[in-house]
């Protein structure tokens, strides 16, 4: 039966579902310690149930004074490193490193399952979070006592929407205006959601009016928004799917992260360029999460020899999707055997090498997982050495296909093709053309044709999966990588495995709708002809008129 949102608050629906169906504890606001910005009782309960020896070695809970020292250190770690890093890597206190979370276990490890079951997922309504203000946040979610997310909820029945929730975060949840509100401070909480019964928006760093909220919607009919839900609330997938324990664990383990990138900026006082480290707190958008999860599921179930076309428009965050996919593909197992021995990312963007390295290093301490191959020799060495992730440039693609189809035919590979910048970077097409014919390309925009020609000329090797990311695939690309779908008339149509359309990107504000600002040739010609033929014609007025055409 569809839920009657007019009879139940959205808050009640969400909290009740997490408590009754997802196995969350329901907390109360007084559980939250405003001094430390976390739930001390649940942190203590989690640690005592899993790490008694470490507690004894450090005497961290033997007195109120020792407890205060422990929680002060933990709170400082949240501020410095961020909650996701503390959950993944734990934190050091005196001589011990305390685990703050136990990750999702494999099916082959019953002991790990027992530890995972010790994790405490908790949802709290109306959290009073500040020492100075009496404001409360609608919904607060914690894991082992550490803050994961906050939510401000609205519903159309009361005449408010997600935009009102965003406004509330920007105007009433400014961390600079209230330093005692630790849950609002940078890094200490992974994500903040603005939710109504139709739409979801998210923000990873609250900065007053500068807070940037991104859509976390599924998309509907190729555009923005969410499809109708059988339960009546279009946003029910948030608590029914995304916030399930295994799903939330997956996001925290494999997607959420803090990245650092060096950028040259101009010093306003000296005028000189200086290097500045840009910090970004990342939480996946829904289409990224859905895409990577579907690709992993299909790979796990179908093994090697598959082809996938991912049609993601500009503004989709392809670079992050590619890094998340590459990192997780190398971890897929069939029993105890890796499904893929190596994942190869074919790109023209050198910066993607750095991005993948940085992203993976933020997940686990894994040395030499990623290698960059910019020559035939380094590529050959990386392949022969069995590197887990190899990033290489496009004109080495012919060698890759030949190598994995002959001397490495007993190994299994995943090939991720990054075509994101094919229409923006002429050098990519030129390199592909040189690889094929030794000549400079006449058409700078035919990267897809080059890749297709290479693959056709050598045939698709059976010991590899292909994951082709592109914004606007040509018919040949659809035929080569798309999923075959038989039609009623007997013909076979090839469709993308996953889509984030240009229409959705435009409606969500990630790219401009150029059609709103174009001028027809007829209008342009008419104005130019009039101006040239009449020296007294008002050019300013003509330009204004042209803009309105």
Annotate each language-model stretch with its function.
Residues 1-342, 351-366, 395, 405, ...:
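ATP-dependent helicase/translocase motor core
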Residues 146-148, 187-190, 340-341, 387, ...:
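Short glycine-/polar-rich loops that comprise or flank the Walker A/P-loop
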Residues 157, 423-424, 476:
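Catalytic P-loop NTPase motifs of RecA-like helicase/translocase cores
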Residues 193-194, 390-393, 464-470:
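Structural recognition of the conserved hydrophobic beta-strand(s) that form the central parallel beta-sheet
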Residues 229-232, 476-549:
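Interdomain helical connector at the RecA1-RecA2 junction of SF1/SF2 helicase-like NTPases
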Residues 347-350, 370-380, 394-399:
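Conserved helicase motor
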Residues 362, 376-390, 406-407:
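Conserved motor-coupling elements within RecA-like helicase/translocase cores
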Residues 387-419, 423-434, 441-456:
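Conserved RecA-like ASCE ATPase "motif II neighborhood" in helicase/translocase motors
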């Amino acid at each position: 039966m569809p839920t009657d949102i007019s009879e139940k608050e959205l808050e009640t629906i969400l909290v009740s579902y997490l408590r009754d169906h997802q196995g969350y504890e329901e907390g109360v606001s007084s559980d939250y310690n405003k001094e430390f910005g976390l739930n001390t009782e649940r942190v203590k309960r989690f640690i005592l149930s899993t790490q008694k020896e470490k507690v004894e070695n450090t005497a961290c809970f033997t007195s109120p004074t020792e407890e205060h020292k422990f929680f002060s250190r933990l709170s400082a770690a949240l501020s410095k490193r961020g909650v996701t890093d503390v959950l993944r890597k734990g934190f050091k206190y005196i001589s011990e490193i305390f685990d703050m979370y136990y990750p999702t276990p494999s099916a082959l490890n019953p002991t790990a399952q027992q530890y995972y079951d010790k994790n405490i997922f908790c949802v709290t309504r109306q959290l009073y979070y500040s020492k100075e203000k009496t404001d409360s946040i609608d919904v607060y979610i914690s894991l082992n006592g550490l803050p994961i997310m906050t939510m401000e909820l609205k519903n159309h029945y009361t005449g408010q929407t997600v935009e009102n929730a965003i406004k509330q975060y920007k105007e009433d949840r400014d961390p600079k205006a209230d330093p005692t509100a630790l849950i609002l401070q940078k890094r200490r909480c992974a994500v903040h959601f603005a939710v109504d019964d139709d739409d979801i928006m998210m923000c990873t760093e609250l900065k007053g009016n500068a807070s940037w909220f991104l859509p976390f919607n599924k998309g509907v009919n190729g555009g923005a928004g969410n499809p109708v839900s059988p339960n009546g609330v279009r946003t029910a997938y948030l608590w029914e799917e995304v916030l399930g324990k295994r799903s939330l664990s997956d996001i925290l383990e494999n997607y959420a992260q803090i990245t650092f990138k060096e950028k040259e900026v101009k010093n306003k006082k000296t005028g000189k360029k200086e290097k500045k480290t840009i910090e970004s707190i990342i939480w996946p958008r829904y289409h990224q999460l859905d895409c990577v999860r579907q690709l992993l599921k299909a790979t796990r179930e179908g093994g090697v020899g598959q082809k996938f076309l991912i049609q993601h428009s500009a503004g989709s965050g392809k670079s992050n999707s590619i890094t998340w996919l590459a990192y997780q593909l190398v971890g897929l197992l069939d029993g105890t055997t890796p499904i893929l021995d190596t994942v190869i990312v074919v790109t023209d963007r050198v910066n993607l090498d750095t991005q993948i390295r940085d992203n993976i290093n933020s997940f686990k301490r894994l040395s030499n997982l990623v290698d960059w191959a910019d020559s035939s020799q380094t590529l050959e060495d990386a392949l022969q050495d069995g590197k887990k992730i190899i990033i290489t440039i496009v004109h080495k693609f012919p060698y890759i296909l030949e190598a994995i189809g002959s001397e490495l035919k007993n190994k299994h590979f995943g090939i991720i093709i990054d075509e994101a910048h094919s229409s923006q970077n002429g050098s990519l097409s030129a390199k592909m053309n040189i690889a094929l014919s030794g000549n400079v390309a006449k058409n700078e925009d035919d990267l897809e044709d080059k890749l297709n020609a290479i693959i056709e000329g050598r045939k698709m090797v059976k010991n590899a999966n292909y994951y082709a990311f592109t914004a606007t695939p040509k018919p040949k690309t659809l035929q080569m990588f798309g999923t075959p779908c038989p039609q009623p008339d007997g013909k076979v149509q090839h469709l993308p495995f996953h889509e984030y359309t240009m229409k959705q990107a435009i409606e969500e504000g990630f790219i401009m709708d150029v059609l709103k600002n174009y001028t027809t040739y007829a209008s342009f010609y008419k104005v130019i002809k009039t101006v040239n033929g009449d020296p007294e014609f008002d050019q300013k007025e003509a330009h204004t008129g042209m803009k309105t055409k």
